[in-house]
Swiss-Prot record:
It comes from the Bacteria. GO terms for biological process: tyrosyl-tRNA aminoacylation. This is Tyrosine--tRNA ligase. L-tyrosine binds at residues 40, 177, 181. Belongs to the class-I aminoacyl-tRNA synthetase family. TyrS type 1 subfamily. ATP binds at residue 240. A motif ('HIGH' region) lies at residues 45-54. Catalyzes the attachment of tyrosine to tRNA(Tyr) in a two-step reaction: tyrosine is first activated by ATP to form Tyr-AMP and then transferred to the acceptor end of tRNA(Tyr). GO terms for cellular component: cytosol. It holds the Pfam family tRNA-synt_1b. GO terms for molecular function: ATP binding; RNA binding; tyrosine-tRNA ligase activity. Homodimer.
Amino acid sequence: MTYHPKSDFLRVMQERGYLADCTDMQALDEALSKGVVPAYIGYDATAASLHVGHLLNIMMLRWLQKTGHKPITLMGGGTTKVGDPSFRSEERPLLTPDRIDENIEGMRKVFARYLSYGEGATDALMLNNAEWLDQLNYLDFLRDIGRHFSVNRMLSFESVKSRLDREQSLSFLEFNYMILQAYDFLELFRRTGCRLQMGGSDQWGNIVNGIDLTRRVLEGEIFGLTSPLLTTSDGRKMGKSAGGAVWLNGEMLAPYDFWQFWRNTTDADVGRFLKLYTELPVEECDRLGALQGSEINAAKILLANEVTTLLHGRDAAEAAEATARAVFEEGGVGGALEVVELPAATLGEGLSVAHFLVAAGLVASGKEAKRLVAENGLRFNNEPVGDANTPVTAATVGEELKVSIGRKKHKLVRLS
């Protein structure tokens, strides 16, 4: 029988499709109904930006704050030095402390778009687990914390078991990650009264570890809640596109390309994505998702505008839509297209089309460029390019050259 939550937060989670599992739904619902509940999601600083795959959990934190509770974004300045082994086929490369700090700063910019930070009861709080993990005494930690963990149980977690079943090495360093993440929950409960950890369903084992540890050490009543691991209707993992990761930082992915990612949503995903990634009413999301034929394209544009507005602002969303209209409907250039600067010296007396595309970073290899041309997938200033060996000179580029790769990828190349 489906449980019907009383609290606004759990009701939103259930209605909009954010909820996969919860350790104790009724007890958490009671706690959320009685007062402010601090809740956190942890983010290891493995890249300079978060990507679209992180956005679902960020929206959960946003809804948590909108429904009167306190979101905590926990930066993994300490755990990133170890690396989360969950469902990975190999050990992560270790990052330097300076790189970790740079990555955290890049992530901070994204969170500031979705959450309101401050000193109030429901203002968001950003913490770094390096504050306590860097201070740990190893022997004390083994005695006080390590004794609460069963290696037998840890080996049974699917995230670890799948790695071992493939006979791939799991280092002692990575194995410790689970204990450190569990300790984070204990420390957050001690410092802030945090009572809820959220994350993707692949984090279930780590979350349960933290709950068990905190109950054993501090006898705290705390909870875990996970979201489904999201894939598109055609089976692709969220966060990736044909061109690579869909980054949330504007410096790493232009707002136009971010907008275009959402505009290209498969028809079957429109209603679901509207519920997960926008704040439109559920009934409106369902209505838009049920549209057919050409009408669904208007819903996709609305989806792209709403998601881009949350991240980059309304002006950026409107500029992206105007550019898309100019590019696709009017054959123009559009002011929001990403500009690629190519040193004039690189072009020299001229390069073949294939070498030009590689030099500008628009394709990964000459082989890919030749395949693109052979499949009639390349245009310069809206004109088809029929020969990968055609020379590209400074005169070809002029003030700027619009390069279209397929129907959906468009860049402006300028010489510098």
